[in-house]
């Protein structure tokens, strides 16, 4: 099977359920990505957290990218690619230093990531200046595509898409009348919370800001319980969200609790405890993993279950790898490939409009029985 044909087949089959075994071989026929035409040592990079408080989200994405890489290498044995991981720990300053290393390594022709909005903003100028294409699975700050960068792309909807849907769910499904909105002061958390505030209008009964790595939320808990709120929205990440809901429930709060994709992780339940976490609503522009993808993911990642943005990690990597399969070996050629990408992915149809993906779906996941249950689209 010719390599070009193989990658087109992979993309179609992935969207249908990741039944990829039929595409696991290539012939020795000459193609754009075979033999001496393929440079040796081609690499893609992953940039995102692998350690630290928010490592789970980064690991989910890099593991998803591993599945795409495995599929690619099985189908393209004549032009194998490796992925080098760069651990930002979710820190924009660390990500900036790592971006310099990535740019200086000329064997790296594309980047899966950055994973977080803050580090995406911090590294955008550098990657754009180097002409090195990046495809993020999870950076949702709407402002990231307003800087004129031609290299930044994402395969997920933005907070500008998610926040109105979150507000709609709070009003129409939770039927809340008084909502207390809290954010973690991060670029991501405040941006999402501000969008929810706007969508809720006069239903907002109170606001507060906390900090990342904060563990004592007693002052905020007092404000919430004193406000008479029947719902709380939190913009931030799972470590603090779990502690916040735990302390709210301990103080007698009986209302609903909602947070966004930064909290959609088993770490939320671990921090909160199952009893406190049960009933929480966690929204995300990320699709639930299919059974077929879950099987492949576990096989490629030592039995680990796919998590938030794992499937999007697959899609982000596959956007880049499919270009390599078509003989796009230089940074310039891959950038052009991604800018004009228009194919079905695992999670959605992927086509970019100035870096933003065209297809937008927001899912609501509910915690029940001490687990995050499969999400359903917010209508």
Model regions and ranges:
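C-terminal motif of bacterial Sec signal peptides marking the signal peptidase cleavage site
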Residues: 19-22
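Bacterial signal peptide processing site
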Residues: 24-27
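Beta-alpha junction/loop-to-helix N-cap segments that form part of ligand/metal-binding clefts
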Residues: 30-32, 59-61, 71-149, 212-217, ...
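Extracytoplasmic "Venus flytrap"
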Residues: 32-66, 84-93, 115-116, 182-190, ...
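Periplasmic-binding protein-like
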Residues: 46, 102-115, 135-137, 178-183, ...
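Extracellular/periplasmic Venus flytrap/periplasmic-binding protein
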Residues: 97, 142-143, 150-252, 288-292
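Extracellular/periplasmic periplasmic-binding protein-like sensory domains
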Residues: 245-314, 324, 368, 372-374
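Segments of small-molecule ligand-sensing domains
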Residues: 304-310, 321-371
């Amino acid at each position: 099977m010719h390599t070009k044909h193989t990658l087109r087949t992979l993309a179609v089959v992935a969207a249908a359920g990741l039944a990829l075994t039929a595409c696991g071989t290539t012939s020795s026929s000459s193609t754009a990505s075979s033999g001496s035409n393929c440079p040796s040592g081609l690499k893609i990079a992953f940039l995102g957290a692998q350690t630290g408080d928010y490592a789970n989200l980064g690991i989910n994405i890099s593991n998803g990218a591993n599945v795409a890489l495995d599929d690619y290498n099985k189908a393209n044995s004549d032009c194998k690619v490796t992925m080098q991981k760069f651990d930002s720990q979710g820190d924009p300053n660390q990500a900036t230093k790592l971006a310099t290393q990535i740019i200086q390594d000329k064997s790296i022709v594309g980047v899966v990531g950055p994973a977080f909005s803050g580090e995406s903003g911090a590294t955008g100028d550098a990657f754009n200046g180097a002409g090195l294409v990046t495809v993020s699975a999870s950076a949702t700050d709407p402002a990231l595509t307003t800087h004129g960068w031609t290299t930044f792309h994402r395969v997920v909807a933005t907070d500008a898409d998610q926040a109105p849907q979150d507000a709609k769910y709070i009003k129409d499904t939770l039927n809340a009348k008084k909502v207390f909105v809290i954010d973690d002061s991060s670029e991501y958390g405040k941006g999402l919370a501000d969008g929810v505030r706007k969508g809720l209008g006069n239903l907002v009964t109170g606001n507060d800001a906390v900090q990342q790595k904060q563990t004592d939320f007693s002052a905020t808990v007092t404000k919430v319980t004193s406000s008479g709120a029947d719902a709380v929205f939190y913009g931030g990440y799972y470590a603090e969200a779990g502690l916040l809901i735990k302390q709210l429930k301990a103080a007698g709060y009986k209302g609903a609790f909602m947070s966004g994709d930064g909290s959609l992780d088993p770490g939320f339940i671990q921090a909160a405890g199952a009893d406190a976490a049960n009933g929480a609503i966690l929204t995300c522009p990320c699709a639930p993993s299919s059974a077929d993808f879950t099987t492949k993911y576990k096989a490629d990642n030592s039995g680990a279950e796919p998590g938030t943005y794992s499937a999007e990690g697959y899609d982000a990597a596959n956007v880049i790898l499919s270009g390599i399969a078509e003989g796009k070996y230089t940074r310039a050629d891959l950038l052009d490939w991604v800018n004009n990408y228009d194919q079905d992915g695992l999670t959605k149809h992927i086509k970019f409009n100035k870096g933003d993906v065209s297809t937008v779906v927001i899912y609501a996941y509910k915690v029940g029985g001490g687990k995050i249950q499969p999400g359903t689209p917010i209508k």
